[in-house]
Amino acid sequence: MGPLATAYFIEMVVKMTDAQFDYEHIPMVIYNKPDTPDRTKYILDKNMDNPLCAMMSLAKALEGQGVHYIAIPCVTAYYFYNELSEGIKIPIINMVDETAAYLKNRKIQRVGIMATNGTITGGFFRQGIEDLGIKVVEPSGKCQDKLMGIIYDGIKANKPFAMDDFCMVEKELRDKGAEVIVLGCTELSLIRRDFAIGTGFLDAMEVLAQKSVMLCSGKLKEEFNDIIT
């Protein structure tokens, strides 16, 4: 639903697949519909347009195309995961649960989350991680405002933004004891791609891409087994 994030997700899946020839790659059906009502706006204010109907229409359209799994490269959309899953007969890969499981398997004990206001307020990412016994720290209000500026005024608007703001949020989460910081917004994946942000990050969209390759009978390149920087 975010066009840049969607394009990058496709690139991730292709690059993660160990394929020598085109026909060894995973067949994909892409439905890019950026006019879907904003998920964060609705989570914060239920008087805003509810995106569920539009997302359900997308899911049913993909189901009609004969896909076996649906991957949604938008973390905030997982606020609606249960309702979407109940409305179709094919599985939606749960990026939140898969990220939490990945952290648990790596024995991470304390995690920081960078995400939209919708994801933070909705609490579903925090809950998904805490359910596996991992402690979660989140940005303060001031740092969250900086992060939203990066996501909405910078990346989504395709405009420059201050990496110093990103570093400020990172420092706060590290100071709170985060061993790993989850990039819990697919727009933030583009920062991971375009900037040298250092170690100790896990990109939730990379987890989704990795799981997509594995579920769809693709062969995962060995270098993508460990995706914590």
Predicted segments, located by residue:
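Non-catalytic structural scaffold of enzyme domains
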Residues: 1-229
